[in-house]
Amino acid sequence: MRGCTEVITLLNAQVDPDTGYDVYTPTKITGVSWYSMAAATVTTSGLLAADQYTVRIPVDADFSGKGYVNPIAYKTADPAKSFTIQRGDVIVRGTIDTPSRITAADLSRLIGSDGSYIAFTPPDPTATTVDAITPASVQQTCSDVFTVLSITDNRKAPHAQHWKVIGK
């Protein structure tokens, strides 16, 4: 595909069986197309604005050595060897320096006060508090982060096989 020069980090959610909380596993994907636009809707109660993102991920992109599995198989898959694309996952434009798995609370620590991405420092392993930080709150902090709303699987096309991911 043409214009596939961007790098993204896909954060897949997987439920930790010990805690019951979502744990996010990052996958760096190189060679994708990133498009964003400001979208607005006028309603009787005022103007509603939300950025819309479209990312096209070619099947021949660099997935950092991981293989794609469908969302159902990902629930029990080894996240170090596989990734999926599903509603609710988070996509960040660029590379995030993280450990292999991060929690929703850790995700909030990846954003600097100026909105830029920073190197990740693992939290104190002896801490027992659980922060209520969610991917949605990260999206409010940085303009180049979105939550996946829909996925179109275009891998059966004769040319330019890819996944089309749309989010806000």
Identify the meaning behind each predicted range:
Residues M1-G20:
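Polar/acidic, low-complexity leader/linker segments enriched in S/T/G and N/D
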Residues D22-K168:
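Short, conserved turn/kink motifs that form compact alpha/beta structural patches or helix kinks used as
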